[in-house]
């Protein structure tokens, strides 16, 4: 399941490369908020402080970087902006993903692979996250939505062990 549907981006030569936004389909606001001029200014500030390090890329970003999924079961919430609370939600169409949840409550949900984000204790301990707000969109990366439920369950069980 993983090899057939996920490995092309998350376990291949594409690791560390930029996947075009049009291909991934996720919220573009992070790209729009960090332009090349921002990197130029940040690199100058670091250099002015006397810090020697490799600078930030000074070109305008065009997409998001493909990453390994090792340990993904403990990296919730998901997508680049943390807009999807569980892996099970990520395998649903964006229209069915939660529109509001609470981030910051650190009780793990092993069945759905993420952190509990809807119960009263999550509301008390967490911060409200609304996907309708600019930059918080949970659309895109709808690669698992067509899988039968049994295959989604198998994929979730697989990533729990990697």
Predicted regions located by residue number:
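Periplasmic c-type cytochrome electron-transfer domains
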Residues: 1-162
């Amino acid at each position: 399941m993983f090899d057939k549907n996920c490995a092309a981006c998350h376990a291949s030569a594409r690791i560390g490369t930029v996947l075009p936004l049009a291909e991934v389909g996720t919220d573009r606001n992070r790209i729009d908020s960090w332009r090349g001029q921002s990197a130029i200014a940040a690199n100058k500030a670091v250099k002015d402080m006397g810090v020697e390090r490799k600078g930030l890329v000074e070109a305008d970003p065009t997409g998001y970087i493909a990453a390994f999924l090792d340990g993904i079961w403990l990296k919730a919430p998901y997508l680049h902006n943390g807009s999807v609370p569980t892996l099970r939600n990520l395998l649903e169409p964006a229209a069915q993903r939660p529109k509001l949840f609470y981030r910051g409550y650190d009780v793990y949900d092993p069945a759905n692979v993420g952190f509990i984000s809807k119960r009263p204790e999550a509301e008390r301990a967490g911060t409200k996250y609304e996907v309708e707000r600019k930059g918080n969109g949970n659309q895109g990366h709808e690669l698992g939505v067509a899988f039968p439920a049994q295959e989604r369950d198998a994929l979730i069980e697989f990533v729990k062990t990697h």
